[in-house]
Every structure is written in C-alpha cells, then in structure tokens.
A protein has these predicted regions:
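A generic secondary-structure signal for well-formed alpha-helical elements
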Residues: 76, 83, 111-115, 155, ...
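Conserved nucleotide- and phosphate/pyrophosphate-binding catalytic cores
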Residues: 29-31, 166, 172-339
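N-terminal Rossmann-like or analogous alpha/beta NTP/dinucleotide-binding catalytic cores
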Residues: 2-148, 297, 301
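Short helix-capping/linker segments at secondary-structure and domain boundaries
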Residues: 113-117, 152-159, 259-267, 297
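Classical nucleotidyltransferase
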Residues: 102-104, 118-127, 131-181, 185-203, ...
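A generic structural motif
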Residues: 23, 158-159, 213
Length: 339
C-alpha cells in the first residue's frame, strides 16, 4: 500500500462499501448512471471494494463463458476511464479471491432454501431469460453468493438500485442467522438506493445487456445517435401532430438525467403541444449523451496504450482484497470450529 493510499484510507471514515458488476458484455449508460458515477463519489468518503463478478456471470452464462476474460479487461478500462482510482479503491476480480466461494459454501450450510426461492429476481429472471436453463443450483444460490461477497469485507453499505434491496435484506438475514449460531462475526449492512439507477433502454425496458437495448460507454457518436434516435417514445404520438406527455415517454427519462432544466421545460412544452416531433425532441438529449461519453472514451484510449494496466490493477486489488478476506475467514472458521 502506498503512503498516499494509506493517508487516503485514514481520511475516509464512513465505513466499508462493497459492490460488483458482472462481466457479461459492454458497460452502458445504465451502469454509468446507476452505479459508476456513484462509486466515483463514494471512494472519496469510504473504503470501497469494487469487484468484477465473474462467478456471478456464470450463473446465467455458464454455457458461453468465452467472453468473460475480455469483458473483464474491458470493464477495468471502463472503470478507470470514468474515474475509479486504484490508489483509493480496491478493484479486483471475484474469482481471484477464493474466500468468496468458501464463505458462500459455509453460508449454504445454514440458510434455508425457501429464503433463496423468495428473492424476487429469482422468478423474474427466469421469466425474462426463458431461452436459458436457469434451473441450476448456481442460479438459485447466487443471492447467497452476493451475501458472501458483501459480508466477506464486513461492508457497512451496499449501493444498489431499488430492485436489488431484497438482496441486501437477505444479506442482513444471513448475518443475523450466522451471528445467532456462532457469535457476533458479521455486521448487518444497509442498502444505499442509488438515484437514477433505473435508466431506460432503447425499447423502454430497463437498459440491460441481456435485452440488447443498451448504449455502450464505448459507442461512438454515430452509434449513440443511431440507437437513441430510434428510442421508443410516448405511444400516443403516432403522428407528428399528436400531442404527448413526457411522463409516459421513456426517452424523456434520459432528458431528466442529461439535460438542463430549461431544456427539459422546452421539450415538455413542445411534446404536450405537438409543436416539436419526437426526433427533434431527442436531438438535444443525444448531444448531451455524446458530450458525456467523449472524454470517457478519450481517457479509455489513453489507458489502452499502457501495456498491462488491467493486469497490474487486478493484481494489486487481489492482494488488498485477499488480506481482508483471509482475516474474515479466520474468524469464520474459528467460530464454526474449523480451525
């Protein structure tokens, strides 16, 4: 650990924060606004552990693991480009810290199966990803693996979208049950609901790699325009002369994220009076998105010229994460009579 990092650690006193992202494809605007911007701010005030959740990727993409390694490298480049600092935050790959799997295994000894079956996303993802066989032990148990990810570092806070709050509540229940059996080893973390976490995709559903409706952080200006100009809008605006209502328009959500108050007011007035069409309405929003992505992409290009940068970041992150994980697992093994 560098002197600068040690000083930074000592100046941050708001508790440990843990979060991760699955390397199942290119990061997109949903990740940027729903997680990454928040992570960049959190690292200023908290000890942060951000990890590439490659084992979690296998819970749904087990039949096609070929992209995990390259997606991991791309994800680290994106993280660095948006402002995550490896001298401040611990950036690592889940599978390189085997204590995640060990703690998951030990938790599986004490957690009732119905606790996992009642997690809302268990049924929701099975419905949404019907082309995949998700009747696996790994998929059923992935919320418990999330609990292990969080509790391994004794996180105080977990930044999540509102739809992920049940996972945090499960983690709190896991901590309580373990502590009741074996003594006070784990704190109960709290969920931090991230504003702007739900970014709509081009089809109006939540932006997701799985749905093919995402604007990637690496999309150039032309690709951003092509995707967003086709984004669905208020269904009442079938013709240019039909008035609409921004509250029923998925594209307006991006105006709320990216545009100024005056720009939103002009768009709202134009939509409700049909004085502007949907294509014209989107122009200013598209330009704002392009303006935000341009410097991120430039920083990313600079990072790609630094040979071995992702490997260096992950190696240092693994070292720091492993030190904490080993300490926690020493306590766990002792509490469970495994020493």
């Amino acid at each position: 650990m560098s002197n600068n990092q040690q000083t930074s650690d000592e100046s941050r006193s708001s508790g440990i924060v843990v979060s991760g992202t699955r390397p199942t494809g290119a990061l997109h605007l949903g990740h940027l606004n729903g997680a990454l911007k928040n992570w960049v701010q959190l690292q200023k005030t908290a000890r942060c552990f951000f990890f590439v959740a490659d084992w979690h990727a296998l819970t749904t993409d087990y039949a096609e693991p070929g992209g995990i390694a390259e997606n991991t490298r791309a994800m680290i480049l994106d993280w660095l480009a948006v402002g995550l600092d490896p001298d401040v935050s611990v950036l690592f790959r889940q599978s390189q810290v085997p204590e995640h799997a060990e703690l998951h295994l030990l938790f599986s000894m004490i957690i009732p199966v119905p606790w996992l079956e009642r997690v809302p996303s268990y049924k929701e993802q099975q419905d949404q990803l019907q082309g995949r066989d998700l009747s696996t032990y790994g998929f059923l148990g992935y919320p418990l693996l999330q609990s292990a990810d969080i509790l391994l570092y004794k996180a105080a806070r977990v930044p999540v979208g509102e739809d992920q709050l049940p996972h945090v509540e499960l983690t709190r229940e896991v901590a309580r049950r373990f502590n009741r059996f074996y003594g006070p080893v784990f704190p109960e973390p709290t969920g931090m609901v991230v504003e702007a976490a739900r970014v709509p995709g081009t089809d109006g559903r939540k932006m997701s790699k799985s749905y093919g409706n995402a604007v990637a952080l690496t999309d150039d200006a032309d690709a951003v325009h092509t995707k967003l100009v086709r984004m669905v809008t208020d269904p009442r605006r079938q013709r240019r002369s039909d008035p609409g209502d921004p509250k029923d328009c998925p594209a307006f959500r991006l105006h709320e994220i990216y545009c100024t108050e005056q720009e939103r007011a002009e768009v709202t007035q134009g939509c409700r009076t049909a004085s502007i069409g949907c294509v014209d309405c989107k122009k200013v929003m598209i330009r704002r998105v392009q303006d935000e992505l341009a410097p991120i992409q430039e920083r990313r290009r600079e990072l790609t010229l630094r040979r071995g940068i992702t490997e260096e970041v992950l190696a240092e992150g693994r070292k720091q994460a492993a030190a904490v994980a080993e300490t926690t697992m020493g306590e766990v093994r002792g509490a469970m009579g495994l020493l």
